Amino acid sequence: MGAKMIDLGEASKVELVLESSYTSRDVALYALGVGAGSDPLDDSDRRFVYERGEFHALPTFAVIPQSNAMLSTITPTGFNLPGMSASLECLLHGEQYTELRAPLPTSAKLKHLVRFKNAYDKAPNAVVEYGITSVDESGRQIMYNEISFFVIGGGGWGGDRGPSAPAVSPPDRAPDAVIEEKTAPNQALLYRLSGDWNPLHADPAFARRFGFDRPILHGLCTFGYLGRHVMKAMFGNDPRKFKSIKVRFAEPVFPGETLVSRMWREGDTRVIAETIVKERGKAAIKNGVIESRD
């Protein structure tokens, strides 16, 4: 089955160029989708949701342009890139790395160079990794993303199992900062307006097909909450200090649940973080590493 989903020979040749654009409206809508502005009187959030004054894109918005470009490759049969063809129900977002290589503009036209990085045989499943470099119209690199997909049923071709990813364990001490924030019951419906239209996050009947009693929150929405919390608690709420974020998605979140971001400072520029679902005591995000600029 895996051979039908992943053709390493073809995948290794991938150097796909995709395009996308966004405006200040998209930037503000994304910020609302990851909880900014839930208190309209909170001055610290206004710069991310109100286009006048000192308007900024949230750093984790850097995942959206390339994500939407990748989603444009979806066909009626599912996700379809050279060397990989899998239906959406076979794909799980395993890990995400996002790095800002220039100040994030509040509107832009971008080109995204998509390169295949690795595929590992975790029979009967597989892990596939892509790297995406995004440049503006002048050719300047704006952001870089690495996406790791867990492909259900995609393994079994006898390939390399790959390295065991080192766990990033929180220090054995109390967190340096904790932010607790309840998501809205319609949080997934709001976040999906940024481009991820997967019915798993909107259609109760569709969600039940995958064992959930109701739609779940997008993993990248939880990712956005964590990035916003770290920026606020550890970087003085200054998006210019935010360099990169890497996480592993561990547990689904249901809209309306409470996210608890726990943060530990390590050195001058590194933060270890995790996201706990308060109501169930489950870690939704593990192995969080966020880097700031010097």
Predicted regions and their residues:
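Catalytic-pocket segment enriched in acidic/His residues
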Residues: 205-289
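HotDog/MaoC-like acyl-thioester-processing domains
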Residues: 2-16, 68, 91-179, 253-256, ...
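Hydrophobic, proline/glycine-rich low-complexity stretches
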Residues: 2-109
